[in-house]
Amino acid sequence: MANPRDTLKLLREIEKTYPCTFIRGNKENYWIHHRKNSEEEWKTGTTTTGMLAYNFAQLSDEDIDFFEAMPISKEMRYGNLPVFTICHGSPLVVNQSLRPDYEYIDDVVEKFTTQMVICGHFHIQTSYERKGKLVINPGAIGVPLHSAGKAQFLILSDENMQWKTEFVTVPYDVDKTLEDMDKEELFQ
């Protein structure tokens, strides 16, 4: 993503008006690690590490402190509705994928403390039940996979004191995004 400073500024503005919960993901962990181990070199260019290096160069110590303070998971409570957990990878490990086809899923799911977990990390909208627990991935806004280039997210709503989930896929201005990336010379 081009202009991470703009994204962080927007998030901090939203946080002033609305209650927000931020969860640390693997990218934040990479930046935290890199600040502590700056002698490790990242490649530049169009690779994942190049994008990490580009973003890290834009971040301040205050930003990294903000990331470091984020939990990797959190139980969410809303009135009398069922408690659920949000996380990036899994509630246990920040970069552990909860893809339903992975062999270890049953063992991991058994350790969940809530009946519903909303995770990210693998960027594919999905919902499945294992061991009586519901695992949901809302997809992704910035790097959605299997979405025909559209942004994805999830809406949770109360339906008779139970959570109703609605997957949403919307178009966004891909050309503008590519233009922003080109201005930042991210294709060099």
Regions found by a protein language model. Give the residues of each.
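Active-site environment of divalent metal-dependent phosphoester hydrolases
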Residues: 1-2, 27-32, 92, 116-129, ...
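Core catalytic region of metal-dependent phosphoesterases/phosphodiesterases
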Residues: 1-57, 61
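Active-site neighborhood of phospho(di)ester-bond hydrolases with catalytic His/Asp-centered motifs
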Residues: 21-26, 87, 116-123, 135-139
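Active-site-proximal segments of metal-dependent phosphoesterases and phosphodiesterases across multiple
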Residues: 42-46, 80-112, 144
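Metallo-beta-lactamase
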Residues: 47-83
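Conserved hydrophobic/aromatic beta-strand scaffold that supports enzyme active sites
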Residues: 73-75, 86, 127, 153-155
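Acidic, His/Gly-rich catalytic cores of divalent-metal-dependent hydrolytic chemistry
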Residues: 128-188
